[in-house]
Amino acid sequence: MDGLRTDGGAAGAAPASSSSSSSVAAAAPGQCRGFLSAPVFAGTHSGRAAAAAAAAAAAAAAASGFAYPGTSERAGSASSSSSSAVVAARPEAPSAKECPAPGTAATAPPGAPALGYGYHFGNGYYSCRMSHGVGLQQNALKSSPHSSLGGFPVEKYMDVSGLASSSVPANEVPARAKEVSFYQGYTSPYQHVPGYIDMVSTFGSGEPRHEAYISMEGYQSWTLANGWNSQVYCAKDQPQGSHFWKSSFPGDVALNQPDMCVYRRGRKKRVPYTKLQLKELENEYAINKFINKDKRRRISAATNLSERQVTIWFQNRRVKDKKIVSKLKDTVS
């Protein structure tokens, strides 16, 4: 019996040792498979612990003297299943991770085109590719070192996320990038329109603009001041730079003229002659109803009247005589 127990124990120990070696062999391929990935220490220790537990169970069965026929097979299967479970439970790291070559750019999925953008490293400007679903070229914004638009970097002021929302053809990107300008004191780009002066608006969109019509000195703004149906300033010699024309609005009209004929149409207000002037004119008319140039000048100097006023008075005086004569004829007849 002792010999049989010894043989059975040896037979049980042999499968146990073979199972432990198979478990170690099963664990070894897992380690070789994960050579490029992070090592999993927990899985290795658990596999070794399972092999040691199987060997201890076989040794205990041999020591008790009852070597059941399926003990070694169950121990070997348990160790192999534990090692396979460890290999299956360990996450497989991406050992074949694709690293782009130094001279090539990272490839994007075929369905999503690449969006060009750049970074400043030192004194150079490098472009990369970024999948945003926008049809832009890889080097759309690539230029010489210190590439900028208007003296400022593109990626600092241009909103790349805004470009992703709208579909822009690849051939229009360089042209559009040239049209965008930047002010030094403003952080947002504005669209430059050639042929116009760049000015910053000081009025808001809802604020009304009040523009007053300011007339120049000596400018006769008839239509702006009073309209065509109103009275017209009728002074013979209009003074230049008068305060009356400084304002173009009817409410601001200054009524400080001495003759008060601002709103009169036609002749100026009649000024009656003095008795001395009338006496001198009547004496000259009694001598001769018609005057010549020399006589007109002499009367003008004596009466302090203009030559035109003297001429008009003589005309009116002749018309008055005709009326008197016509009335006398009517009374006689």
From Swiss-Prot:
Transmembrane domains' residue ranges: none
Organism this protein belongs to: Carollia perspicillata (Seba's short-tailed bat)
Q: Which protein family is named in the record? A: Belongs to the Abd-B homeobox family.
Q: Which residues bind DNA?
A: 266-325
Q: Does the keyword Nucleus apply?
A: yes
Name of protein: Homeobox protein Hox-D13
Would the keyword Transcription regulation be found if you checked this record's keyword annotation?
yes
Q: Per its UniProt record, what CDD domains does this chain match? A: homeodomain
Localization, per the record, is: Nucleus
The main location is nucleus
